[in-house]
C-alpha cells in the first residue's frame, strides 16, 4: 500500500506505546485512524493529543481478549468511517513467566491478548478490507521473542504464533490484494512490563509472586531497565508506516538481535 492518505486504519493497543506511535505515524501520513484500547482514560487522552494536530481520529474501548468486544469495535469503525484498509493487531501483554511460575490463568490471558486477539482481528477485519476491493494491509505485532525465545514461555509461544500466522497469511492474502507484515520489536520504551495494570478480574490468579532475589529477579530487573531506556515508540511507528508502504514481510526496530537470529537458523541447518 504505497499511499496511506485517505485510507482508514484500525489499531489495537493504541492508547500508548507502540500502538500510539503507529497511530501517530499513520495520521501524519493522512490516514484516518480508529484507536482501540482497554484503557479508556489513556485512550481519550491519545485521541485528544492527535486531534490537536488536525488528525482525523476516533477511538473505541475494547478488551481484545473478548472476541465480542473486538467485533463491536469493528462495527464502530465501519459506522464511523465506512471502510477499513489497514488492520494493526498491536495489543499485547507480558505474561507467563519461566517454568515453575506458570498458572493456567497466566497462559489464558497471555495467549488471549497476544495471539487469539490477533486471530480474531484478522477474522473480523479481513473480510471488511477485502470487501471494498481497494486493497489493504495487516500488521501484527510479534516480538524478537517470536524468533528467539526468552524466559517467559507463554509470551514466547504467543509471539511465535503471531510470526507463523503472519507468514502463512502473507502468501494466502497476496492474491486478494492484502499485504501482511509482522513487527518484531526489540526493547521499546513502553509499559509492557506493567501489563498487570490491565489484568481482568477473571484472571486474578494469573500471577504467582515473583522472587525478589536471585537470577530470575535480576533478569526481570535487567529487562525493565532495557525497556525504560528503549527505542522511542514514535520511531517504531514510522518504521511500521514504511513497512506498510513497502509491503515488507518483516519489520525490525534494530539490529541488536541479528546475531542471535542468525545463530538460531544456523543451528536449524
Language-model segments: residues:
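Canonical Rossmann dinucleotide-binding motif of NAD(H)/NADP(H)-dependent dehydrogenases/reductases
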Residues: 2-34
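Active-site-adjacent segment of SDR/Rossmann-fold oxidoreductases
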Residues: 29, 128, 168-178
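The beta1-alpha1 cofactor-binding region of Rossmann-like NAD(H)/NADP(H)-dependent oxidoreductases
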Residues: 40-41, 61-72, 104
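Substrate-binding pocket helix/loop in short-chain dehydrogenase/reductase
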Residues: 98-99, 106-108
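Residue(s) in the substrate-gating loop at a strand-loop-helix junction
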Residues: 143
Amino acid at each position: 500500500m504505497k499511499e496511506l492518505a485517505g485510507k482508514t486504519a484500525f489499531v489495537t493497543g493504541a492508547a500508548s506505546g507502540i500502538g500510539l506511535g503507529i497511530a501517530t505515524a499513520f495520521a501524519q501520513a493522512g490516514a484516518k485512524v480508529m484507536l482501540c484500547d482497554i484503557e479508556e482514560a489513556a485512550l481519550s487522552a491519545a485521541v485528544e493529543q492527535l486531534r490537536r494536530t488536525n488528525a482525523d481520529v476516533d477511538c473505541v474501548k475494547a478488551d481484545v481478549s473478548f472476541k465480542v468486544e473486538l467485533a463491536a469495535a469493528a462495527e464502530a469503525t465501519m459506522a464511523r468511517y465506512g471502510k477499513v484498509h489497514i488492520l494493526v493487531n498491536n495489543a499485547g501483554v507480558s505474561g507467563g513467566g519461566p517454568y515453575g511460575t506458570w498458572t493456567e490463568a497466566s497462559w489464558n490471558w497471555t495467549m488471549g491478548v497476544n495471539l487469539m486477539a490477533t486471530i480474531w482481528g484478522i477474522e473480523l477485519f479481513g473480510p471488511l478490507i477485502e470487501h471494498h476491493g481497494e486493497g489493504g494491509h495487516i500488521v501484527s505485532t510479534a516480538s524478537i521473542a517470536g524468533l528467539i525465545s526468552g524466559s517467559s514461555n507463554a509470551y514466547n509461544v504467543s509471539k511465535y504464533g503471531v510470526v507463523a500466522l503472519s507468514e502463512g497469511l502473507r502468501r494466502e492474502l497476496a492474491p486478494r490484494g492484502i499485504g501482511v507484515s509482522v513487527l518484531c520489536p526489540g526493547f521499546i520504551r513502553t509499559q509492557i512490563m506493567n501489563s498487570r495494570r490491565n489484568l481482568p478480574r477473571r484472571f486474578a490468579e494469573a500471577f504467582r509472586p515473583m522472587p525478589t532475589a536471585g537470577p530470575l529477579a535480576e533478569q526481570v530487573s535487567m529487562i525493565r531497565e532495557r525497556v525504560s531506556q528503549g527505542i522511542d515508540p514514535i520511531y517504531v511507528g514510522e518504521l511500521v508506516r514504511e513497512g506498510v508502504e513497502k509491503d515488507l514481510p518483516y519489520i525490525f526496530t534494530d539490529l541488536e538481535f541479528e546475531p542471535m537470529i542468525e545463530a538460531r537458523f544456523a543451528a536449524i541447518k
